[in-house]
Structures are given as C-alpha cells and as structure tokens.
A protein has these predicted regions:
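Membrane-anchoring alpha-helices and their flanking helix-loop junctions
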Residues: 1-96, 108-175
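Solvent-exposed interhelical
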Residues: 99
C-alpha cells in the first residue's frame, strides 16, 4: 500500500467508523439512555456489581475485537469497513485473525459492546436495542452482505463461506 493510498484512506476510515460502529454503539444507546431516563447503576448490590463487571468485560472485548477487525480491513483488505467505492470497502477478502473462526467478528464485537451496555445499565431498553440490532443484522447479512461479497470476491468467498460459520466461531481456525 502506498503512502498516498494510506493518506487518502484515513478520512474514509473515520467516516465509516462514525457511520456504523459509533452510531450503533454510542449515539443510539445514548439517545435511549436520555429518552428512558436511565440512571447510573447503584453499586451497593452484589448482583448489580456482577452485571457491571460482566458488562464492562463484554464492552472491553467488543472494542478490542472491533478495533482488531477494522485494522485487518485496512492492513490485509486495503480498505475500510465502509461499503462501496466511496468509502473504500476492502479490495481483498479478509481471512485472517478472527475471520478464520467466524465470518462476522466485527459484528460480534459490536454485539459485545451493546450487550455490555445493557448489562452495565441493567436497562431493558438497551437490551431491546441489542435484540433489534441482532434481528437487523441477521436479515442484512443473509440477504444483502453475503450476496454482495459473493459477487465481489466470487469463488474465494464461496470457499470461505463453506468453511467458516456465519455466527458461531469454529474451535480451530480455518487454514
């Protein structure tokens, strides 16, 4: 990858990241918290402390997975998490790191963050947002993303799809 390519890609990374992960994991949950009047958890209860701890761990793992997969899109795929030429989706299929175990580790990271937020706040509203997000992803990935990836990467994606599960990670890495 050339220096010019890297310079031209930084703003695409920023826009892609702001459009998808930041909106889904920060903006929408913040609006829900404000609209529902959700307050900070009362840390006097062992159950609440447990929920906050588990939630914080889910958020940390989710952020780590999200950052790792975005970095792989850049370094291996030479693109961003954006779709189409404008935002620079990867020109090469990414089949490294967590992509060897599961086809959607980036979404898994976002799911970890959303579920963690629901746990930390003990909010049914944020749990509902998590469920809505899952439902939308189930439909979008199956009926839009996978056909798009098949058209873009052809036989390489077909082989990847046959060998790596969509949601439940493989125990051993593929390849």
């Amino acid at each position: 990858m050339t220096t010019t390519h890297t310079r031209n890609l930084w703003w695409r990374h920023l826009i892609s990241f702001l459009i998808a992960p930041v909106t889904m994991t920060l903006v929408i949950p913040a609006l829900i918290v404000i609209a529902a009047g959700i307050r900070a958890p009362d840390l006097h209860s062992p159950i609440t402390i447990g929920l906050v701890t588990v939630g914080a761990l889910l958020i940390a793992v989710g952020i780590g997975l999200l950052v790792w997969t975005v970095a792989l899109f850049d370094r291996v795929g030479h693109g961003t998490l954006g779709v189409g030429n404008t935002l620079g989706e990867p020109v090469q299929l990414v089949v490294r790191g967590p992509y060897r175990q599961v086809r959607n580790p980036m979404i898994s990271g976002v799911l970890g963050i959303l579920l963690g937020e629901a746990a930390v706040t003990a909010s049914g509203w944020l749990l509902l947002w998590f469920a809505v997000f899952v439902a939308v992803q189930l439909i979008a990935i199956r009926f839009w993303e996978e056909p798009h990836l098949h058209r873009r990467y052809g036989a390489e994606y077909a082989e990847y799809r046959r060998n790596v599960p969509r949601w439940i990670p493989r125990i051993s890495a593929w390849r």
